[in-house]
Design a protein with these regions (language model features):
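Compact alpha-helical subdomains of small soluble proteins
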Residues: 70-141
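Short, charged/polar, low-complexity loop and linker segments
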Residues: 28-29
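Sec/Tat signal peptide C-region and signal peptidase I cleavage site
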Residues: 13-19
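Short N-proximal segments of mature Sec-exported proteins
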Residues: 32-88
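Sec-dependent N-terminal signal peptides
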Residues: 3-13
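Helix-turn-helix repeat elements of alpha-solenoid scaffolds
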Residues: 19-25
Length: 141
């Protein structure tokens, strides 16, 4: 019985893990911030989407005004850079929108899982991606 309860506790953590963190993606694509425009667009779009999801979480939360404003500002910056890069490469709008929907769903589910398990949205892989966006990607913009 204890093993079953342990498995039930661990399954949500496994099922909502990000397919790949930005840090891992960046390490596998070393030219992301120079010649690899496709990776640059992908990374900046994920950062933009991540911050949109965070801003929505804190939008109407008491005491969350500063986080909301910061997240929204970052979402606009990353999304604009990603969109411009994607258009520059000749990418199609519908493909860009599909990628955005996919990652909004993934980050939303991961955030809800983090709240349920840890009591906060920005934890684990989400926290790792926030750090990657701010420490690695933002300086490259």
């Amino acid at each position: 019985m204890k093993k079953l309860l342990l498995m039930l506790f661990l399954i949500p953590n496994i099922s909502f893990a990000l397919p790949i963190t930005l840090n891992k993606y960046i390490s596998k694509h070393p030219s992301w911030n120079s010649s690899d425009k496709s990776s640059f667009s992908y990374i900046t779009s994920r950062c933009g989407i991540l911050f949109v999801v965070i801003s929505e979480r804190y939008k109407n939360m008491t005491g969350g005004e500063e986080i909301y404003k910061m997240a929204l500002t970052n979402a606009v910056i990353f999304s604009k850079v990603s969109s411009d890069t994607y258009k520059e490469m000749g990418g199609k709008t519908n493909a860009f929108q599909e990628r955005a929907k996919k990652w909004a769903r993934i980050y939303g589910e991961e955030g809800v899982n983090n709240i349920d398990v840890y009591g906060e949205m920005i934890h684990g892989d989400v926290k790792s991606d926030v750090s990657s966006c701010m420490d690695k990607v933002m300086p490259a913009i």
